[in-house]
Swiss-Prot record:
This is Small ribosomal subunit protein uS19. InterPro entries: Ribosomal_uS19, Ribosomal_uS19_bac-type, Ribosomal_uS19_CS, Ribosomal_uS19_SF. GO terms for molecular function: rRNA binding; structural constituent of ribosome. Gene3D superfamilies: 30s Ribosomal Protein S19, Chain A (3.30.860.10). Keywords: Ribonucleoprotein, Ribosomal protein, RNA-binding, rRNA-binding. It holds the Pfam family Ribosomal_S19. GO terms for biological process: ribosomal small subunit assembly; translation. One of its GO terms (cellular component) is small ribosomal subunit. Protein S19 forms a complex with S13 that binds strongly to the 16S ribosomal RNA. Belongs to the universal ribosomal protein uS19 family.
Length: 93
């Protein structure tokens, strides 16, 4: 279920302050954050936000189509290495 419209989008306060500071300065430095639960708002457009995936920070460049999604959607936490291929010749004896 989506969040109620009367509540508005959730953005961690420390992340919101960092984005507002960058907007006031007019700079586009990489903003490092651990807040995967924060929603992308229009103020973040054009910024690169480094989202933590549990090991490292993955840089995410925010575009217009990302507004309304969560930051964590763009930094996958699991690495799928693929299934092991069966060795059919070894099993036939």
């Amino acid at each position: 279920m989506p969040r109620s419209l009367k509540k508005g989008p959730f953005v961690d306060q420390h992340l919101f302050v960092k984005v507002a500071r960058e907007n006031d300065k007019g700079t586009k430095n990489v903003i490092k954050t651990w807040s995967r639960r924060s929603m992308i708002i229009p103020d973040m457009l054009g910024h690169t936000i480094a989202v933590h995936d549990g090991r490292k920070h993955i840089p995410v460049f925010v575009t217009e189509s990302m507004v309304g999604h969560k930051l964590g959607e763009f930094a996958p936490t699991r690495t799928f290495r693929g299934h092991v291929k069966d060795d059919r010749k070894g099993k036939r004896r």
